[in-house]
Amino acid sequence: HTNVIHTGHARDIISTLPEKSIAACITDPPYNYEFIGHKWDADEIRRRLNNVNSTKSSTLVKNIPYGSHLAGGVRNARWYERVRENILDYEEWCYEWALEAYRVCKPGAPVAVFNSTRTFAHVQVALERAGFYARDCLVYRRHSGIPKGLNLSAKLEQKGDPDAESWAGWHSSFRNEWEAIALLQKPLENNYTNTVKNYGVGVFHTQDPSGRFASNIIENIPSDARDNGNDYPTAKPYALMARIVNFLVPPSNNNVILDPFCGSGTTLLAA
């Protein structure tokens, strides 16, 4: 199974892997959004991205599900019920693939799962239910991002409300410039030293590229070149994935990394 991309349902593919064979699981699963819709083909991706970037379009996203919290409609009791149902369905989906990931991970194997700042707690709970225990939340700081939601002053001004100016600077959400990485670990075999000796994993490489003790905030990551031929809309920078691999996985030919949602393959290249 090493150095191979398998296509199929993540849970079903992971079920074919040997027990206690994986040194780390590093993955960037769907965030419970629908930014590019259900068709993951390059033409559809390109069409929607071009629409988003067009100065003639005022629409940022279309067909938004309740999971994004950007969906329109009246915010009545049923709206909030559907938001709750949606996120619990997502948590259950994470739990399903995490159960198999737990089986194939070695004792002490770290699991790093990217997710949005709003939903990563549900991912952590799902993985804890599967048997992993929480270690940290790593922060990938991007130094970018656009505000999403309602500009109250602008909305009131559209309606001709005389109080519009008094609400200048008030918005329904903050500008998001970071992504969460839920960091969990399969329980150790008695202690750290036994686990490392028997399985080659269990501790973190805590020296960052500058030689300092690494923190749980990862920043100053260069972006990949725009003309690298990668049309995948949510690809993570290679430098980011390489740093995470360096932090979590001791270099060894016996250490295999699992990425159940490999996207354009950045984690695979970094490994």
Positions of the model-derived regions?
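S-adenosyl-L-methionine-dependent nucleic acid methyltransferase catalytic domains
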Residues: 1-271
